[in-house]
């Protein structure tokens, strides 16, 4: 903040690792088909049952405290594991729809408690991107692939439902980490202009002329 910047922090609030104190203390806070069986893990994770009021309050209170104490301006809400075999142990009923509504409510409650807070629904492959989330989020993340050639199609079809200014579109390094395709900075920057531009690129490794060119593009985007 002292340098005129805003502070963002990356969260993955719906996920819990079975090898964690939270899971060991509250195994009933996880969506699962039966009492004795968990869904298949994804990235060593299971899904917290936000339809359970106690679990909801725990997640909300933890995030609310961090936003207030750290002065967080921007939240990236990640969501990597697919919500499968999602039954709430509390009710014994399918919970995908209610889980989604609970996520909307956390977004709404956090933004009401912290005016000016922005939240990105950052989920690779669109796991937390739908028309409902557009009412409560400030930005969505279309894909972890930032190769501008691939992004042309991603942006094209995502923008059929999502306004371009809400679609995160980043300038990455060349070659791209996801496709290993080498592209010019001009192409990468031009593609980023079709969405909500950002940068995910280790500029400490780049020559000054690349950084200067990037600064010119950024200044143009801000006009």
Which residue stretches match the model-derived regions?
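Glycine-centered short loops/turns at secondary-structure junctions
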Residues: 2-4
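Anionic-ligand-binding alpha/beta catalytic cores of soluble enzymes and soluble regulatory domains
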Residues: 214
């Amino acid at each position: 903040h002292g340098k005129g910047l805003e502070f963002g922090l990356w969260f993955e609030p719906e996920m819990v690792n079975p090898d964690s104190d939270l899971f060991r203390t509250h195994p009933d806070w996880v969506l699962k088909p039966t009492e004795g069986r968990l869904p298949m893990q994804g990235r060593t994770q299971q899904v917290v049952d936000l339809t359970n009021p106690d679990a909801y309050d725990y997640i909300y209170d933890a995030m609310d405290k961090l936003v207030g104490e750290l002065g967080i301006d921007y939240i990236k809400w990640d969501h990597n594991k697919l919500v499968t075999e999602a039954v709430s142990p509390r009710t014994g009923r399918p919970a995908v729809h209610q889980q989604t509504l609970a996520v909307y409510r956390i977004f709404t409650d956090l933004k009401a408690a912290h005016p000016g807070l922005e939240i990105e629904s950052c989920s690779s492959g669109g796991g937390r991107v739908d028309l409902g989330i557009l009412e409560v989020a400030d930005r969505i993340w279309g894909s972890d692939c930032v190769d501008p050639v691939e992004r042309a199609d991603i942006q094209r079809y995502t923008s059929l439902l999502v306004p371009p200014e809400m679609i995160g579109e980043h300038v990455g390094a060349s070659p791209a980490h996801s496709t290993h395709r080498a592209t010019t900075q001009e192409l990468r920057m031009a593609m980023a202009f079709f969405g909500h531009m950002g940068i995910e690129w280790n500029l400490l490794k780049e020559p000054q002329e690349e950084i200067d060119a990037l600064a010119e593009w950024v200044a143009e985007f801000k006009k």
